[in-house]
Amino acid sequence: MQIQNLIAALAGMAVVAEASVTFLDSPLSAALAKRQNKGGNNNNNNNNNNNNNNNNNKNNGGNNQLCLNPNNVQKGSQQAGTPKQGQANSAVDQANFINFCTGQQLTNGEQKTAGSCNGVVMGKIPSQNNMVSTIIKNPPPGGNLQANQQFNVQLKVNNLQAGSFTDAQSTYYSAPQDTNGAGNIIGHVHVTIQDMGNSLTPQNALDPKQFVFFKGIDDAGDGKGNLQATVTGGLPAGNYRVCTMSSASNHQPVLMPVAQRGAQDDCNKFTVGGNGGNGGNGGNGGNGGNGGNGGNGGNGGKNAAVNSGNADNGGNNDGGGGGNDGGNNSANNSGSGNKQGGKQQNGASTGGFPGTSNQFPGKTGTGSGAQTGNANTKTQAGGSASNSATNGNSGTGGKGGATANAIGGIQAPAVTNSGDSSRPFAVNGNTFVNKAAAVQRACDIQRNGCFDAINRGKLTGSTADCDAQLQTCTQQLS
């Protein structure tokens, strides 16, 4: 019995000794490892796989486990394709690129302006019969709106279950695109408006960091695809592009099943405060009567005043000098006449914004944009042209300011002298015919910066503070 106890004690000491040197490169440690693994890999595999499965299967029945289910491996990612000349080889990976973001800054549900890597899968793709399609109904292409007057951007979207809008500050791109029981993408639509400067046909692409209006439509509209976003306070006079950006719930652009298709989004170009009204081929008098093609030609209709010396003086009248006198401002007739790039159309301009050439040839303006200037009224055969002067957005009170006390230190850009007598005011390289429009633009830029900072979580408070500051900014810069 004593001998048995002694043997057992010696065996125990041997086990302790072996355990103390398992990390040393020795025959003893190798033998112990082999004995523990029963051939090398079984225990490791069991431990690794079982532990991963046991630990991670507790969440949603295994949907969030850290190992890739072999059934989900896509062989399409394992080959580079057969590119034609000039095409590129695809990147390849044996495991769906699950570790593509290793060592990089992760997106992690945040809007990281310096760039990041997002490892979340793309998600469910709709069928070809369920592809998203959008049309912007208002503002219409080539439309002209009144300056500084509220309007609605109106859309019709097909095959999107709208109204699903997650927290953009903590769940940005953090979940896959999903579809509903009908096969339509679940998500929402963003609307963005950008200033195009002095032309509706610029030669350079617009800066995506610059926009005058942005809205994520987080409601379902009428449930039939009709959505809208309200542009409170309207826009100052200028040339603009409005576009949609259809998104899944977590704000990623919607993904479609085929490459060759129509676009899922839409854009329209329009003007605000342009020289259109009821002139040209239509309106009050059309192409007949009243000695000069046209009723209310030139700056006719309910069009804006003066434009700081840029009045049209009757547009490009080919009708023999009769009837198209509209808006002829005796006090400020030193402008260039804005002949719309030489495009003549029966004695009237084509409805574009002052100082802009070749805008939608053949289009007549629809609006009655009001701009600062000397109010004038001129009665003429075929109708009257009313030039009303407004100052827009004067407001009182509010928080912050244009420069001093600006919320978050986000200041409005300066209103400067452009050196162009026809458009003497400038803001960030864009020129304006009057100071009120320039001030409005500067304060809108500050407002957008304030909105962006609050939406990104860089500032505390609410976007209502940004709206309140807009009024103060306008007062101070005016």
From Swiss-Prot:
The keyword rRNA-binding does not apply. Residues 1-19 form the signal peptide. Induction: Expressed at all stages of pathogenesis. Among the most highly expressed genes in appressoria and biotrophic hyphae in planta. It is found in: Secreted. Keywords: Glycoprotein, Secreted, Signal, Virulence. This is Pathogenicity cluster 5 protein d. Its main location: secreted. GO terms for cellular component: extracellular region. The gene is CLU5d. The lineage of its organism: Eukaryota, Fungi, Dikarya, Ascomycota, Pezizomycotina. It comes from Colletotrichum graminicola (strain M1.001 / M2 / FGSC 10212). The keyword Glycoprotein applies.
